[in-house]
Amino acid sequence: MLILRLTLAGDREALAQKGHFYGVYLLCSQSVDVRHRGKCYVGFTVNPKRRIRQHNRGSSFGGAKKTSKKGPWQMVMIVHGFPNKIVALQFEWAWQQPTLSTRLKIFDDLRRKLPRETHFDYNFRIVNRMLGVGPWHRLPLTVRWLETDYEREFQLPLPRHMRIVSGKVAITTSQRALAVKRTAAAAAATASWSSECHLCMQRIEHPERSRFSCLNASCCLSCHMLCLASYLLDDQPGQYLPIVGNCPLCETPLVWAELLERKRFEQGVQIQGEDENEEEDRDELSDCPDVDSDVEHICELSD
């Protein structure tokens, strides 16, 4: 199984298995034709590196019709961390159609681009607003700058649990090996975990799927996923998805998204035996899950 390497600011690394990465990106045209230069395009992808190649090669190679022959394009930013493909596609549609989105059409300032405002600034203003309203403001999202020339401050502050980082997204063989080592280490650590949940005191069946532990390696917390979620949501009636909280044993700050990411990671990562470059060349034009955003009608999240 492939590993996406996400290079964060400060040399911090995060790992995501292929099949668990869903991103909504913003392209900016660098065309020499003044009719197209500076125009923007919002799309969805499971593989940013491959997707930008498709856009720049044209619609015959998997790129969107709307971007064909209007480039070259730069992927300047991407929002990722969505729990599944459907939620990411809904976010993409709302970003493309703020005047039609139930969540966004109430904001008069998003109805049109302001005089002398660039297409990028307008799209950035839309996504800034989106990240502060429901249901997206509760998601553990990461805003990733891919081109430093476009980086700027958000006028509206983002929720505390969201991250703003810089760096490319790449698939590397070395990260696959690292993933296997970490998985083996996690498996070894489970041997010392309690077989009972610290919160409900019941036996944890199928611990490989349902047992959660603390992010603090020295903490011995062992509990059901649902028990920990209920504990973290104790003071948030009406909510079903935790965001942040503290460990019930050691008070270490916990980020629910990081717990889920680690659980997926611990469930096993297989190393592909074939050469990475050959695999990427073979797959780059058949990105089946990487739906193009020319789709006009996608249902929004229910109110």
From Swiss-Prot:
Its EC number is 3.1.-.-. The keyword Acetylation does not apply. Catalytic subunit of a heterodimeric structure-specific endonuclease that resolves DNA secondary structures generated during DNA repair and recombination. Has endonuclease activity towards branched DNA substrates, introducing single-strand cuts in duplex DNA close to junctions with ss-DNA. This is Structure-specific endonuclease subunit SLX1 homolog. Residues 294-303 have a biased composition (Basic and acidic residues). It is an enzyme of class 3 (hydrolase). Residues 20-106 form the GIY-YIG domain. HAMAP family: Endonuc_su_Slx1. One of its GO terms (cellular component) is Slx1-Slx4 complex. Belongs to the SLX1 family.
